């Protein structure tokens, strides 16, 4: 059994589906509530909930989790004489609930088969699969086959952002910048507009000039990567603070918490967040892996944070 002790505790969700195809007369019995054993949809929902809760008992290497929510939907599809079952499972933990969602769908479908087999044992179960999951290091995943033709509006639509890589070696063309492009791709996925992406050496004056230029260009979000460690030239946090920026302590705490699943060295990082002239300035570590985990942590926080920085009332902002 995999040790998940070092993984970060995050909110995790999963959504799965499956279907059962019935003979026409059996389909009619189910949809009209004419089964001798009771309401087929209600019993399938109960079975699905039980399936999610007992997943760790069925699968030997699956971690037992404190399930916080299970929702089972049964959708009759008259054209194909099928019942589509969808399960949504939610928890806050160190590992995902994909198997719980799949187990819930399977249990609900098996319950429907059990309720109807006396009329027709040839009912067919199929299409069981994961639709979507969120949480953890990998963030949001959606099964490609069901991805919408038009991408939904990203969480940072309309936000102007700047990416600043802080590295002596990258600035001198002695190393490849991996974290900067990673942040840019993430911002693009969130529908943000990238005003500038630049690289500067580990010089406080250069860091400050890049930040001030970003603010002058109207960037509401300024993401820096690098210069947050214990090295003699790691001075990104000091450069930001010396501009008169107001610290947001929880950001650094959350970034280190998110990175602890990657390495214990995350506790040596001095990454953090600041408010400066109406912009949100966030200093991420230089490691691309730490950047990935940090961005996953920031994703649900940024829309609310940026709205509040613009003067929105707390009660009118979701999240």
From Swiss-Prot:
Span list, region Molybdenum cofactor biosynthesis protein B: 146-319
- Quote the catalytic residue positions: 114
Query: What UniProt keywords apply to this chain's record, in alphabetical order?
Result: Lyase, Molybdenum cofactor biosynthesis
Against InterPro entries, the record matches this protein to: MoaB/Mog-like_dom_sf (IPR036425), MoaB/Mog_dom (IPR001453), MoaC (IPR023045), MoaC_bact/euk (IPR047594), MoaC_MogA (IPR012247), MoaC_sf (IPR036522), MoCF_biosynth_CS (IPR008284), Mopterin_CF_biosynth-C_dom (IPR002820)
Cite the annotated pathway. Cofactor biosynthesis; molybdopterin biosynthesis
Q: Where does substrate bind?
A: 61-63, 99-100
Q: Check the record and name the PROSITE patterns matching this protein.
A: MOCF_BIOSYNTHESIS_1
Sorted alphabetically, which SUPFAM superfamilies does this protein's record hold?
Answer: Molybdenum cofactor biosynthesis protein C, MoaC, Molybdenum cofactor biosynthesis proteins
EC number(s) on record? 4.6.1.17
Class of enzymatic activity (EC top level)? lyase
Catalytic reaction(s) noted: (8S)-3',8-cyclo-7,8-dihydroguanosine 5'-triphosphate = cyclic pyranopterin phosphate + diphosphate
Q: Which family does it belong to?
A: In the N-terminal section; belongs to the MoaC family. In the C-terminal section; belongs to the MoaB/Mog family.
Its recorded name reads Molybdenum cofactor biosynthesis bifunctional protein
Supply the source organism's classification.
Answer: Bacteria, Bacillati, Cyanobacteriota, Cyanophyceae, Synechococcales
